[in-house]
């Protein structure tokens, strides 16, 4: 391990969320693992136990953790990886000027201070979670995931309500490590976990598990810095992002990515083609297999957990996009289409896919097979180009599986609501039930500035139908690079979509948090309502805009109805009177015409301006 010279360290957001604590559960098969979750404490008057929720925020919300961005996070998986005996350290490649877009001097982002020798598979070995699963091995990663996915299930076992529609998914009442192994072995789930990203807490992406969300970050040629991108990553996972994609397209790509990975407790994905293009000065026609191969190894050594590879864009499909309203909207897809047309030959990604698999299996980099021909408008949804590419992605999935590589499939895009289910059904059939990972989809094209909403609608639907991971869309989609606030809005929007899908699919214990918040709402436990919400800060601030005093936090009304017309307060009164007089007497009273509003006392009247 080498340590580079010191320099100013970027600052990131830390600290617990309101009324929350970080708790850890130990493994049974692998006692050394400690699975984090967030425990939300309720008000003593509730008489209810704390509510545990899935937590992807890493040590940044742990008050007992020491955060040192220039040192990176604890390498929790390092011993697990080495103990398997199938990896070897080596010197790795040297960083070249083109890795950082030829940035130099003051424009060059400093290297990450700590450098560990990269690992790779020993000759003839596959070090993927898929290879282990097929061999019948339950890895520590698999047990870690089982504990994570079971949050709330054991406590709620007797009261589990399974009234959802899962559209053929096989969601168990209780997730065992063996179930995780089976799903991975069958290719229906992936565990993105590069052996060179030991800081990552294991998670799973699959139709029979909780729906996950991804947040995109990354610099561009005109804006953002390393410090901003590291903070965006930390900020995104604070609010619930399960993975993060670094889509940087400007200078300093290598060094920025190193800072992100070393400080990320969630899997990091990339589109290697973007960096490869920077290495040839942005000229797509000058891309070569050698440049791309070198970029794959560079990123695999750093610890990238999944690659988006646009190998499904074939020369013969490009003409199918000519009459589209919006043509080819995928950056990677358009780059490869331009390359294919210029050279009039098949993409080097398609031609060298076997070799790409060999690289991925040596580091356990999962495939995210890119949808380079996805529709960029609802007018182009479900067209011949989109589904031709999907057929090729199905073929590539089989090739990758044959080499023990983990695979998920990327999906659209822009799709109106009535065409969404066809996408899910075709993907399951064509790609052998490999996990589906979709961008939205956006259900209408008329709302720039609000595309987190247009896409959130489609995301909830396709998540219900079976998509395993949803890629967030921010309000800045189609308009500009998202900032910190946009990242939060996108993450919260997609947490709503993913959770709504979990509820609709009938995931056990998915409703525990909803019911706890509903009881708090009915009992006017305002602090519990805020703390149980996905965004406690916003919920509290909206309430306090009109009722700011501490006394209002225990009031039995809000500013929507006021004390006189509060429906829940009226319901409390009806319930109390019903218990007192009996249901039959109450029914007779209200048939005769009784008052259905509460009298308000002078003490409860809000003063002017409150």
From Swiss-Prot:
[4Fe-4S] cluster binds at residues 558, 561, 566. GO terms for molecular function: 4 iron, 4 sulfur cluster binding; carbon-carbon lyase activity; zinc ion binding. Its cofactor is [4Fe-4S] cluster. Substrate binds at residues 216, 245, 274, 310, 330-332, 371-374, 410, 437. Its EC number is 4.1.99.17. InterPro entries: ThiC, ThiC-associated_dom, ThiC/Bza_core_dom, ThiC/BzaA/B. Homodimer. NCBIfam families: PRK09284.1, PRK13352.1, thiC. Catalyzes the synthesis of the hydroxymethylpyrimidine phosphate (HMP-P) moiety of thiamine from aminoimidazole ribotide (AIR) in a radical S-adenosyl-L-methionine (SAM)-dependent reaction. PANTHER family: PHOSPHOMETHYLPYRIMIDINE SYNTHASE, CHLOROPLASTIC, THIAMINE BIOSYNTHESIS PROTEIN THIC. This is Phosphomethylpyrimidine synthase. It comes from Allorhizobium ampelinum (strain ATCC BAA-846 / DSM 112012 / S4) (Agrobacterium vitis (strain S4)). The lineage of its organism: Bacteria, Pseudomonadati, Pseudomonadota, Alphaproteobacteria, Hyphomicrobiales. The gene is thiC.
């Amino acid at each position: 391990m080498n340590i580079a010279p010191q320099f100013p360290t970027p600052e990131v957001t830390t600290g617990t969320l309101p009324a929350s604590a970080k708790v850890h559960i130990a493994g049974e098969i692998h006692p050394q693992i400690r699975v984090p979750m967030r425990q939300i404490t309720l008000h003593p008057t509730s008489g209810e136990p704390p509510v545990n929720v899935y937590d992807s925020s890493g040590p940044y919300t742990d008050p007992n953790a020491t955060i040192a961005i220039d040192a990176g996070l604890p390498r929790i998986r390092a011993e697990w990886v080495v103990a398997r005996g199938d990896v070897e350290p080596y010197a790795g490649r040297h960083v070249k000027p083109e890795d950082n877009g030829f940035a130099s001097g003051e424009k060059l982002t400093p290297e990450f201070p700590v450098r560990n020798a990269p690992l790779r598979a020993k000759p003839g070995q596959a070090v993927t979670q898929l290879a282990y699963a097929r061999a019948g091995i339950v890895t520590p990663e698999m047990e870690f995931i089982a504990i994570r996915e079971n949050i709330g299930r054991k406590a709620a076992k007797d009261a589990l309500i399974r009234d959802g529609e899962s559209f053929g998914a096989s969601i168990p009442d209780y997730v065992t490590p063996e179930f995780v192994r089976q799903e991975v072995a069958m290719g229906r789930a992936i565990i993105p976990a590069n052996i060179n990203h030991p800081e990552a807490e294991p998670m799973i992406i699959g139709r029979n598990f909780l729906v996950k969300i991804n947040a995109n970050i990354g610099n561009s040629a005109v804006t953002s810095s390393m410090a901003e991108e590291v903070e965006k990553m930390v900020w995104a996972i604070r609010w619930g992002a399960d993975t993060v994609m670094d889509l940087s397209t400007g200078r300093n790509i290598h060094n920025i990515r190193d800072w992100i990975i070393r400080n990320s407790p969630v899997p990091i994905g990339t589109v290697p083609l973007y960096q490869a293009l920077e290495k040839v000065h942005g000229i797509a026609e000058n891309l070569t297999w050698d440049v791309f191969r070198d970029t794959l190894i560079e990123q695999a050594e750093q610890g990238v957990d999944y690659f988006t590879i646009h190998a499904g864009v074939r020369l013969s499909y490009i003409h199918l996009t000519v009459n589209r309203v919006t043509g080819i909207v995928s950056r990677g897809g358009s780059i490869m289409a331009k390359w294919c047309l210029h050279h009039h030959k098949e993409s080097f990604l398609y031609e060298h896919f076997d070799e790409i698999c060999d690289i991925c299996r040596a580091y356990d980099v999962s495939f995210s097979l890119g949808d380079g021909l996805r529709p960029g408008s609802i007018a182009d949804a479900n067209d011949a180009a989109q589904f031709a590419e999907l057929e090729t992605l199905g073929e590539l999935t089989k090739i990758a599986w044959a080499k023990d590589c983990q695979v998920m499939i990327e999906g659209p895009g822009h799709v109106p609501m009535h065409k969404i289910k066809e996408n899910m059904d075709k993907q399951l059939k064509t790609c052998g039930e490999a996990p589906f990972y979709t961008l939205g989809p956006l259900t209408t094209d008329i709302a720039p500035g609000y595309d987190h909403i247009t896409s959130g609608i489609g995301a909830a639907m396709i998540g219900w139908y079976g998509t395993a991971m949803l890629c967030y869309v921010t309000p800045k989609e189609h308009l500009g690079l998202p900032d910190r606030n946009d990242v939060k809005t996108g993450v919260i929007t997609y947490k709503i979509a993913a959770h709504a899908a979990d509820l609709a699919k009938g995931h056990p214990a998915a409703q525990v948090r909803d019911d706890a918040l509903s009881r708090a709402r009915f009992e006017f436990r305002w602090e519990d309502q805020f703390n149980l919400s996905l965004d406690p800060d916003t919920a509290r601030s909206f309430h306090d805009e009109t009722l700011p005093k501490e006394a209002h936090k225990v009031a039995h009304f809000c500013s929507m109805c006021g004390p006189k017309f509060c429906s829940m307060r009226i319901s409390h009164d009806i319930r109390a009177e019903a218990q007192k007089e009996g249901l039959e007497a109450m029914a007779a009273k209200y048939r005769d015409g009784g008052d259905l509003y509460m009298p308000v006392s002078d003490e409860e009247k809000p003063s002017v301006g409150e």
